[in-house]
Every structure is written in C-alpha cells, then in structure tokens.
Curated annotation (Swiss-Prot):
Pathway: Amino-acid biosynthesis; L-histidine biosynthesis; L-histidine from 5-phospho-alpha-D-ribose 1-diphosphate: step 7/9. The keyword Nucleotidyltransferase does not apply. Belongs to the class-II pyridoxal-phosphate-dependent aminotransferase family. Histidinol-phosphate aminotransferase subfamily. The keyword Cell cycle does not apply. Homodimer. This is Histidinol-phosphate aminotransferase. The modification N6-(pyridoxal phosphate)lysine is found at residue 222. Keywords: Amino-acid biosynthesis, Aminotransferase, Histidine biosynthesis, Pyridoxal phosphate, Transferase. Gene3D superfamilies: Aspartate Aminotransferase, domain 1, Type I PLP-dependent aspartate aminotransferase-like (Major domain). It comes from the Bacteria. Its cofactor is pyridoxal 5'-phosphate. It catalyses: L-histidinol phosphate + 2-oxoglutarate = 3-(imidazol-4-yl)-2-oxopropyl phosphate + L-glutamate.
Length: 365
C-alpha cells in the first residue's frame, strides 16, 4: 500500500497534556489547565438543560443541515441561512476550504506563526505553502499581498492571531481586502472574535456584501465554552457556500452539539460576563509582565504570549510539576515564550505566584 506523498513525514496534531495525564504522571490532584484557550467559566447554565433533552434521542441521526442552529445563527448575525456552513469545530471548515480550493500546482498564503491547521490541511491537498513571517507579532499584510500570484487560491488571516493574540484593525483589513485578487479566497478566522474589545477591531460580516471572495470563520469552542462538542461555522456569500457544501461530510455536527450551540447563543449575558472577566485577567498578566520586565504581546484573545528569555519548555516543565498546564512556545514558533490561557481570578493568581517564584529561583529578576 502507498499513501499520498504529502502525508509522509507530516506529523499529526499534538494536543497539550490533559488534566488526567498530568495527575497520573506527577501524582497531583489539584490541576489547572491554561493551555488550550478554553473558557475557564465553562458554558452557559442553559446549555446543560438543552443537552439533557437530547439524551433520549441518541439513536437518531442529527439534522445534517443543522436547520434550527442555522436559523438561530443567521438571525444573530443578520445574514441569510444559505450564507452559513457548519463544521465539527471551525477546524473542519478549514479542512473543507482546503478540500474545495487547494490541489497540486496551487498555493496558499498565510502568516507564520499562526494557527497550524491552515498549513496542515493545505499540505494534505498537495498545495504549495507560502508562509510570511509575522512582524512584531502581527500579520505582514503587504508581504502577504506580494506573495499572491495566479496560482494562489486561499489567503488566511487569523484575527486575533493564535498564538500572539494580536489583531488586524479595520482600516488595515479593508485596505488588504481591496487588493486581494478576485480569484483568491480571503479567509478571516475569528475563533476569538467574542473576546476582541479594541475599538478598531473590524466588524466583518457587513463586508460580505462588498467582497464575494471573503469567508469568515467562527466557533463555539472558545467564548461559548463548547470545546468538547465541536461546532463551528463559516459565513460567506450564498454562491460560495453552495459551491463548497459538497466537500462537507454529512451529519458532521451532532444533535447534542446543535442544541447546545442554540442555548449558548441565546445567553449573551453569559458571554458579556466572560469577556469582561477575561479583560480583567489580561490586565493582571500585563501588570505582572511590566513589574518583572517581561516582553509580551497585548492580546485581543483569551490568552497571552509571554517571553521569559529562557527555553519555553523549561517554563512549561516548571509549571507542570506544580500542577499548572500551559503551552510551550517551542511548538508555536516562539522558543523562549509560553502561551497562557487567561483563567479565573483564582487561577490567574496561582500561576502568577508560581511564575514569580520561578523568576526568583532562576535569578531572572
């Protein structure tokens, strides 16, 4: 048997350590996970009731078109139902886009470092990857435009960017979209959209009326707290959605996930509360960094990337042994940094205490 050439040597996605894994490995009982940008407050209480109602129907296939969720999201966004495509997380919508647009003899343009699934799925389709280095942690939009040619099919903007938390503002984005050729799909991945509070963070849904080659990705995994249920979606023109729908797997979002997402979307008060707490948590980390002379990127997401000036794996291991899971920057393109999810007030205080002790022990302050 012979697999596709591009799969040879392509590593599978490596998730961070789970809480149970750390408990077993280190004999610890009190673990906090601040590695995967999950919502530390969970999901809306209304979600649990919605999920329970679905438990009597587990033998029945889900609605493959996600009609009720589609209606709810369309109303929430002010778009037509036919402008939406749903996925098993927005990761799957990334996969659908790559399936639909990329092949050998095409190329795709993206920042580096950024969310790794753009590259991963493009490699599987045999496309050339054109990675444009970040400048000061931000997308270099001019260089990305210059990398586009006749064979380019997709350009990706992660906004806010993962792992830096930086963002492309409204003026920068509209200037960029004006110059993206019509044969290139511009994908705006807004997984952390709900957390962005900057006054000039772009409101992109209205831009769909101007740009037929624009697609926006969003998810219920982050602010909505449904990471375990895997549901995300893409927003684009009716024509574009119709053309890529054949690349979507049938029944790709479960009945439980659809019901949970509807309930989560209904509770915007919960989202507002989480966003405010996240903003306060970021300020706590900013103060810690500034008091200790540490470099960081101001974030529009629910995480912060901090440069400690030593191996990120060393910081990761120090925290792991104390029951705190973060993400080492070694795997993210920032070898002397770690990415920390903003937790609850108590979680933030615990990790900052541990990091302060580390800085003292390693004589970094």
């Amino acid at each position: 048997m012979e697999i596709k050439t591009q799969l040879r040597g392509l590593p599978p996605y490596q998730p961070g350590k789970s809480i149970e894994e750390v408990k077993r490995e280190y004999g610890l009982t009190d673990i906090i996970k601040l590695a995967s940008n999950e919502n530390p407050y969970g999901c809306s209480p209304a979600v649990k009731e919605a999920v329970m109602k679905q438990l009597d129907h587990l033998a029945i296939y889900p609605d493959g078109y996600a009609r009720l969720l589609r209606e709810k999201v369309a109303t929430h966004l002010g778009v037509n139902e036919t402008q939406l495509i749903f996925g098993n997380g927005s990761d799957e919508v990334v996969q659908i886009i790559c399936r639909a647009f990329l092949s050998p003899n095409t190329n795709t343009v993206m920042a580096a470092p950024t969310f790794p699934q753009y590259r991963h799925n493009a490699v599987i389709e045999g496309a050339e990857i054109r990675e444009i280095p970040l400048v000061d942690g931000r997308h270099d939009l001019e260089a990305m435009l210059n990398a586009i040619d006749e064979q380019t099919r997709v350009v990706w903007i992660c906004n806010p960017n993962n792992p830096t938390g930086t963002y492309v503002n409204e003026q920068e984005l509209t200037s960029f979209l004006e110059r993206v050729p019509s044969h290139v799909l511009a994908v705006l991945d807004e997984a952390y959209y709900e957390y962005a509070t900057a006054n000039d963070y772009p409101q992109t849904v209205p831009l769909l009326r101007q740009y037929d080659n624009l697609m926006i990705l969003r998810t219920f995994s982050k602010a909505y707290g449904l990471a375990a249920l895997r549901v995300g979606y893409g927003i684009a023109s009716e024509t574009l959605i119709r053309e890529i729908e054949p690349a979507r797997e049938p029944f790709n979002t479960s009945s439980v996930a659809q019901a949970a997402a509807i309930a989560a979307l209904d509770d915007q008060a919960f989202i507002r509360e989480c966003v405010e707490k996240n903003k306060q948590g970021l300020e706590t980390f900013y103060r810690f960094c500034e008091e200790n002379g540490l470099r960081y990127y101001p974030s529009q997401a629910n995480f912060i990337l901090i440069d400690f000036g030593i191996e990120g794996n060393e910081v990761f291991q120090y925290l792991l042994e104390r029951g705190i899971i973060v993400r080492s920057g070694n795997a993210l393109g920032f070898p002397t940094s770690v990415r920390i999810t903003v937790g609850s007030k108590e979680q933030n205080e615990r990790i900052i205490h541990a990091l302060t002790q580390m800085l003292k022990e390693k004589q970094l302050i």
